[in-house]
Regions:
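Pocket-lining segment of extracytoplasmic ligand-binding domains
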Residues: 125-214
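Beta->alpha turn/N-cap motifs
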Residues: 36-38, 47-60, 125-126, 142-149
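Hydrophobic residues within well-ordered alpha-helices
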Residues: 44-45, 133-134, 254
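Conserved C-terminal helix/tail region of periplasmic/extracytoplasmic solute-binding proteins
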Residues: 253-271
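Hydrophobic/proline-rich hinge and linker segments of small-molecule sensing/allosteric domains
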Residues: 68-90, 167-183
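A structural signal for short loop-to-beta-strand junctions that line the ligand-binding cleft
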Residues: 2-3, 65-73, 96-97
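Secondary-structure end/capping motifs
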Residues: 184-253
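Bilobed "Venus flytrap"/periplasmic-binding protein-like clamshell domains
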Residues: 2-21, 34, 80-139, 144-149, ...
Length: 271
């Protein structure tokens, strides 16, 4: 049985619904692991999954055994991680520990590129970060996923939008996460299956809602709808030339800054 990992966030449960419910033809049975993306990054590091959602920030350490698929990505515009604090201010003025959702997340890599002088950093589950910021346990927090839509309800203020910064710096969309498959897997099958699952979800969004709500941190329909709209885009159907350029720009610039190992050309599976 194929092991498949993805997060319980609405964008992932939405796009994988058809695949995991047997609605895509000629797909072998899957054993699903639902876990936050940093846990999936770690599982992939231990070669523990056949196909998995991954942070693009984790990819440089994994390419010996895995290749990125062209469908299933979270790439877009206006969807970047935010740095939040209890009081309004400037990112460069933050003094003290910053909560992060993991050291292999793309969000953390973007923060290191944007403000290399900041730190120390305190890794924790992404949904714990707003609470710790509000309680004064950390000076600021790097937020992703559903917390991007709910931080203001906790009285927090955005100091920086790292996606906006990235788009201004590069002119490219924000590459957050993608799908890895083991190089010895049937790559063509999984690219087809995931693309068909994405297309099925776009065509039948109401059918996915119960499964999405079952696993979401936030149950309000407007939050779920905003989450899916922001992170499931045309790039999710197929990464395309622009999306691939965004991923390569992230990995190349991070390697130049000595934050990640250098990646060769064989990052994405062929179309």
């Amino acid at each position: 049985m194929i092991s498949l990992g993805f997060s319980p966030c609405p964008n992932d449960t939405f796009l994988f619904y058809a695949l995991v419910h047997g609605l895509i033809p000629d797909v072998p049975p899957v054993n699903v692991l639902l876990a936050d993306v940093e846990s999936l990054n770690e599982r992939a590091r231990r070669r523990g999954l056949d196909v998995t959602k991954i942070s693009y920030g984790a990819v440089p350490w994994l390419l010996e055994d895995y290749v990125l698929l062209r469908s299933g990505s979270a790439v877009g515009r206006g969807c970047g991680p935010l740095v939040v604090a209890r009081e309004p201010g400037r990112l460069d003025d933050v003094r003290g520990p910053i909560a992060i959702p993991g050291e292999r997340t793309t969000a953390y890599l973007l923060l290191r590129l944007r403000a290399p002088q900041l730190g120390p950093f305190r890794p924790m589950p992404f949904d714990q970060i707003p609470r710790d910021v509000a309680a004064g346990e950390v000076a600021a927090g790097l937020i992703i996923h559903e917390t991007r839509f709910t931080y203001a309800k906790q009285g927090l203020h955005a100091l920086a939008d790292l996606g906006e910064w990235w788009e201004t710096w590069t002119g490219l969309p924000i590459p957050l996460g993608g799908i890895l498959a083991r190089r010895d897997a049937d790559i063509a099958l999984w690219q087809r299956a995931i693309r068909q699952s994405v297309e099925w979800a776009f065509a039948n969004p109401a059918a996915t809602r119960g499964y999405v709500k079952q696993h979401s941190q936030e149950l309000e329909d407007d939050v779920i709808d905003a989450h899916i709209k922001l992170y499931v885009t045309d790039f999710t159907r197929d990464i395309g030339d622009e999306g691939e350029a965004a991923v390569r720009a992230l990995l190349d610039r991070a390697a130049q800054a000595r934050l990640v190992p250098h990646c060769g050309k064989d990052v994405f599976a062929p179309p």
